[in-house]
Amino acid sequence: MAYKTSLDNLAKVVTIIITILFAVIIVGQFSLIKDEGKSVPTFTTILLSLIYFGTFSFRPISYKLTDDKLIIHRPLFDIKINRTEIKNVEQLDKEKLSWAVRIFGVGGLFGYWGKFSNAKLGSMTWYATRRNNAV
């Protein structure tokens, strides 16, 4: 079974705002810094581009459940989890996910993925594009 992903409204808004912000910073810095060396704008452009396209490349685009694996498809490097490693599956309500803290991950730009933690569930790894219907 294959399932396509779609962004929730918050992820859409965050993605649009970050895209506009990065574009304004990249274009604006070159117009403001004319007489100085171009090393700072070039470095900033490379850094913001790496952040943006790196995040884009690792976002979940679909999920596939096979007889032996759960596959999270991403533009780069699919995640494959053996079904034998999955201890249980349950739908999580907002209360269980409340106060989740992003330890190392993305919280809105093209989705929500990476390492998160909260007091109720402990350490979690997310590969999500929506905050509702969490499993």
Q: What function would you assign to each model-found segment?
A:
Residues 1-36:
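N-terminal membrane-targeting/pre-transmembrane regions
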Residues 11, 37-38, 64, 93:
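General structural signal for secondary-structure boundaries
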Residues 19, 24, 44-45, 50:
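Small-residue packing motifs within transmembrane alpha-helices
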Residues 23, 39-42, 131:
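Short hydrophobic/aromatic-rich motifs at helix boundaries and adjacent loops
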Residues 34-46:
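Hydrophobic alpha-helical transmembrane segments
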Residues 46-90:
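Conserved beta-hairpin
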Residues 73-135:
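Non-transmembrane, membrane-adjacent beta-strand/coil modules in membrane-associated proteins
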